[in-house]
Regions:
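Non-catalytic substrate/cofactor recognition surfaces at enzyme active-site rims
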Residues: 1-153
Length: 153
């Protein structure tokens, strides 16, 4: 379906991936969200990253690492307030996406760890007790960058 479709719910899924080094420092984030960066339109006569500029700035400022935005399937998905020349509106949309992403990052488990259910404790109502444990080494991945000199032919 192309264009606005009032008979179907919009996909508002925000997928966030975190890339860390071996001591848990964030090296980068990957963010997938279905929304065209179309806040700014014909009233804006400058080249602009739209809301993604503010998003990337805030992510770098708060994590110390770059972020990669991957636009999800968004044939009909765009900001409700859009087609404007108002740069402040695009910046607002960028802050909304960045702060939502940062909230997801804050809620993620510590790199290399996972939560598991330990027990229930009775305290007027059954309370779940969760503990942290290391992730098995087989599920950890690592990478190394190497440089190869090649002659141009």
């Amino acid at each position: 379906y192309v264009g606005y479709n009032s008979s179907k719910p919009a996909d508002d899924t925000l997928l966030v991936g975190r890339i860390t080094n071996s001591i848990g420092e964030i090296l980068g984030t990957v963010v997938n969200y279905a929304c065209h960066p179309t806040t700014l339109a014909w009233e804006n006569l400058k080249i602009s990253p739209d809301f993604l500029g503010t998003f990337k700035e805030l992510m770098k400022e708060n994590t110390g690492a770059p972020s990669l935005f991957i636009q999800g399937a968004s044939g009909d998905l765009a900001p409700a307030a859009q087609y404007s020349g108002n740069v402040a509106l695009a910046e607002k949309h960028g802050r909304q996406l960045a702060f939502s992403t940062l909230a997801v990052l804050e809620g993620m488990s510590t790199p290399g760890k996972s939560l598991f259910f330990k027990e229930t404790v009775a305290s007027g109502a059954p309370l779940a007790i969760w503990k942290s444990k290391p992730v098995p080494a087989a599920s950890n991945m690592s990478a190394e960058m190497i440089t190869i000199e090649m002659e141009i032919q």
